């Protein structure tokens, strides 16, 4: 891999470290990541355009062009993309960081339908469990509960009237509870979505990483960012959707991680329902939102 990097990028290094997602090395004091690119190559030009708009104005990691002036590099049957990291890879994610990045760029005239995406996701995961269920008893026992949560989220989303002309902002495909800001500034994790997408994911993650300051953070966030009633309803719908469980599900069935990783989730369901109830009560103070009947009253 050292020879590949030197040949395509003119970077001569002594040591490359590999983990299950990327190759990593340090050059001139900066961390670089070399990823296998598994996405539709037709989207790479927009990926690069967005990256150029964000690099310099934020700590967005920079896509490095190869010696052929191409974004992607092919080697031994795989396609790679190289990025240079500017953010502190050890810094924890905060709502302030999410807010800053969401205000850095927006896009109009796109269609984002969480309800349809979630419904398709459930169908896909149901097919997976039907094919592999015997090997994963913990998933089999818990799956219907989380599908029920997702269906509630879909029903709630489908009642929301989306404002025409909404400006979709920089968001992220996935933010896990143990991620650092490196994930926020990874160009391959960038999407354009409703402003509250990342806020909702942060709130959910705050439960699992025991962030006891979440309500103070929300007060501070709302002082700086006005949310419309529509956006708060979108946030609630996303809170109801158990993205964390479905991400772990795919980690287990697709990436072959141990099934026991979901124990920390399924063993705290009563606590989590209480937590969601408290979050929704927090927003009800200033917004006319409906009660969620199945959540515990707080």
Language-model regions, residue ranges each:
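ATP-dependent phospho-/nucleotidyl transfer catalytic cores
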Residues: 15, 112-171, 283-297
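ATP-binding glycine-rich phosphate-binding loop
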Residues: 2-29
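ATP-binding glycine-rich loop module of kinase domains
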Residues: 21-45, 81
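A conserved alpha-helical element in kinase catalytic cores
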Residues: 37-76, 90-101
